[in-house]
């Protein structure tokens, strides 16, 4: 039997990269997956690429009204959620302290922190007992990387959320964990010069960038019963970058 046979999963921000890879794997492993994205054209393309048992819902995680539409769609379609993977997020790799504005701060925190909280809160009534909530973090929160203070702070907030929510939801058997990718070969990295990509890879103990499939496999572990005794952790998938 597949690892997610008959389960219902929601993955936000799943039109590309790591979350798209996770959605594809979850469907392969037997789940019906609801994916979200802000742009309908990208969402439609992702649904077509995944194929099979998937539903696309246009939703901006930074907009509470859009989150209500997501809840309505899941309630009407299946009435429950077994796995919630909060992957939607935004940020920039180059925003030093002197460049941060009120608008840029509010925008990043609005999606990455407020959006994550209200995504979980609004879908919580549909969460099955024994379900899994996965928050998409990042290894940058503990590294002190210049130009990423705001983005890193949002990921540190998710780490705090996971610990608190794991304690709050333990009575329902709901597990809450953070999945923190390191440098991964997605569109953001693909747009950098080759020499920079090589420098980044050289910093990683395993001497390569992560692939979306690497992240998807760990998301599957956290989503499935394989991690039934795991909650409140921050699981780094970074080739050892933040560990060694």
Model-predicted regions and their roles:
Residues 8, 15-16:
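Conserved glycine-rich cofactor-binding loop
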Residues 91-94, 143, 220, 231-244:
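Short C-terminal tail/terminal secondary-structure segment
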Residues 95-97, 101-109, 189, 196, ...:
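Substrate-binding pocket helix/loop in short-chain dehydrogenase/reductase
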Residues 98-117, 134, 158:
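Catalytic Tyr-X3-Lys loop
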Residues 120, 154, 162:
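Active-site helix of classical SDR
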Residues 125, 167-171, 228:
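Alpha-helical segment proximal to the catalytic Tyr-Lys
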Residues 138:
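Residue(s) in the substrate-gating loop at a strand-loop-helix junction
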Residues 178, 201-226, 230, 237-239:
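C-terminal helical subdomain
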């Amino acid at each position: 039997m597949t690892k997610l046979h008959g389960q219902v999963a929601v993955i936000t921000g799943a039109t590309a990269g790591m979350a798209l890879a996770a959605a594809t794997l979850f469907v392969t492993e037997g789940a019906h997956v609801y994916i979200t994205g802000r742009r309908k054209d990208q969402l439609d393309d992702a649904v077509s690429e995944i194929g099979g048992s998937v539903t696309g819902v246009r939703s901006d995680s930074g907009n509470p009204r859009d989150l209500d539409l997501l809840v309505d769609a899941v309630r009407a379609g299946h009435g429950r959620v077994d796995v919630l993977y909060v992957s939607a997020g935004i940020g920039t790799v180059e925003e030093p302290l002197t460049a941060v504005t009120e608008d840029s701060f509010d925008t990043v925190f609005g999606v990455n922190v407020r959006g994550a909280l209200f995504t979980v809160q609004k879908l919580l009534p549909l969460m099955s007992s024994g379900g899994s909530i996965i928050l998409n973090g990042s290894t940058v929160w503990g590294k002190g990387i210049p130009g990423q203070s705001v983005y890193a702070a949002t990921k540190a907030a998710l780490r705090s959320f996971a610990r608190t929510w794991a304690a709050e939801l333990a009575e329902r058997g709901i597990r809450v964990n953070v999945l923190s990718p390191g440098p991964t070969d997605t569109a953001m990295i693909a747009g950098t010069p080759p020499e920079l990509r090589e420098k980044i890879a050289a910093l990683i103990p395993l001497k390569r960038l992560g692939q979306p499939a690497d992240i998807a496999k760990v998301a599957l572990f956290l989503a499935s019963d394989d991690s039934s005794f795991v909650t409140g952790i921050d699981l780094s998938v970074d080739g050892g970058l933040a560990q060694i």
